[in-house]
Each structure stands twice: as C-alpha cells, then as structure tokens.
C-alpha cells in the first residue's frame, strides 16, 4: 500500500512539474478582428529568455533552426524562438544589442529612412527588475544596466496609447506579416506574430486592446519568424539577425 501511494505521489509530482513547464512558455492562436495572430507569453521567473546573434565561432546563427541545432549540441532544447529586431545586410543588429550583459552594438540615435527610424523607436530589455519596453530617448537619458536588450522601431504603443508615428495611420493600406513584443508586467514578456498581413494600426490595437500592454515595440515585418513547437511553428524564411530564445 505504501509503495502504491509513493507511486501515486510521484506521478502527481511529475504531472505538476509538466504542467508548470508547459505554462512557462504558453503560446496560443486566436483571431483578432479578421486576422489570425499567434502570441507566446514567457513566464520570466520560470524561464530564462535570452538574446542570440552569433554562435561560438562568431558566425551569425542566421536561422532559428541553426540556433536550435547549436543549442542541441550543448544539451539544450529550444522551446521558443523569434527574430529580435532589425539588422544590416551582414545580419548585424541595426541598433542596440546586449547579450549576457555585454553590449555588442551601441544605441542607435541616428536619423534615417525605414521603420527602425520611425519616431518613437525603442528598446526591449531584461534587467534585475524584469522585462520592460522604453523609448530610445528614455534609455539614453537614464541608461539602465540590462543583461539583454534589443533596439527596434517604431514603438507600437506608448504609455497606454497607440503612438503618433506616421506609419500608425488608421487609414493605411500597407499590409504585412508583423511581429512585436511587450511586457505586461516585469515578470512576463509577450511576443506576437501575425499569421497573415495586417496594418501597423491593427497590429498596435492587438497589443493595446487584447493584451492590455501600455508599451509595445515593433520588431520587424515580412521576415518575421517564430519557433514554437507547441503550436506547430518552425518558420524558415530569410536569414535573420538577432533572435530571442528560450532553452531548457
């Protein structure tokens, strides 16, 4: 009888651990207005969200599948991955990039054309207090000390409102696959990718209306990619620069 109870207790413990692990990275697919959207919520107290760019040999990973294989060679399993901001032709980050506490690319405050330079642009970061999104100017005025950070643009939502960036025009007809990120609380990060083309304005509305995010950052469009086995996503498209990843 005692042995049977031990087995039952062990089985319950295994189930509880499995449930906790499953919820640490929780992805779901839903329809927002007329567009299907996939979102993945990372519980940062239970999972270590990292930024990746180059492998141990100094070569850009380029593909989420290459990151997965590299981690597998280290005895780790990639459970979530997504492109993490805009990049140059050589796959180097266009703006600030910090991984493992090391700044590999500085904050980019230049003016230019393209979505990255649409004001306001911003930074997603992870530090001792958790996750947050802030504008580039806020970061420059009071530099934090993140263990990981990536810069992109434009900001989709700022202080609880869709930003006034010209690309956020509600009447815009520019439709693309898009992805972005927000931190609804310091201990959670939510990554979103549209499964079909939509406008900037509609994408920003999802973060504001569905997720209740006060600040959200656009990551990229067209090349947007997701690795999330729990919802059957292992996107392979164009080569990528910086990437987010969760590994166990």
List PLM regions with ranges.
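Bacterial N-terminal signal peptides that target proteins for export
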Residues: 1-10
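Bacterial N-terminal signal peptides
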Residues: 9-18
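Zymogen propeptides
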Residues: 21-115
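Short acidic-glycine loop/turn motifs at beta-strand connectors
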Residues: 43-46, 100, 125-130, 159-160, ...
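Short, solvent-exposed aromatic-acidic interface loops
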Residues: 54-57, 138-142, 194-197
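Active-site-adjacent helix-turn-beta-strand microarchitecture at beta-sheet edges
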Residues: 92-167
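Conserved, well-ordered active-site substructure
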Residues: 94-110, 166-215, 224-248
């Amino acid at each position: 009888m005692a042995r049977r109870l031990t087995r039952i207790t062990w089985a319950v413990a295994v189930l509880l651990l499995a449930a906790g692990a499953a919820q640490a990275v929780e992805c779901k697919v839903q329809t927002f207005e007329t567009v299907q959207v996939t979102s993945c919520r990372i519980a940062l107290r239970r999972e270590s969200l990292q930024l990746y760019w180059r492998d141990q040999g100094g070569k850009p990973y380029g593909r989420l599948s290459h990151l997965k294989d590299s981690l597998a060679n280290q005895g780790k399993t990639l459970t979530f991955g997504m492109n993490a901001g805009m990049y140059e032709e050589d796959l180097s980050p266009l703006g600030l990039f910090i991984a493992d506490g090391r700044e590999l690319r500085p904050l980019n405050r230049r003016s230019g054309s393209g979505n990255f330079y649409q004001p306001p642009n911003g930074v997603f970061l992870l530090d001792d207090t958790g996750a947050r999104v802030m504008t580039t100017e806020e970061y420059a005025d009071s530099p934090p000390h993140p263990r990981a950070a990536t810069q992109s643009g434009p900001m989709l939502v700022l202080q609880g409102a869709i930003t006034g960036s010209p690309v956020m025009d509600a009447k815009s007809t520019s439709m693309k696959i898009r992805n972005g990120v927000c931190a609804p609380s310091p201990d959670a990060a939510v990554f979103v990718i549209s499964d079909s083309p939509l406008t900037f304005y509609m994408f920003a509305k999802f973060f504001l209306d569905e997720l209740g995010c006060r600040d959200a950052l656009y990551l990229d469009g067209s090349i947007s990619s997701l690795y999330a086995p729990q919802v059957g996503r292992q996107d392979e498209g164009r080569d990528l620069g910086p990437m987010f990843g969760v590994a166990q």
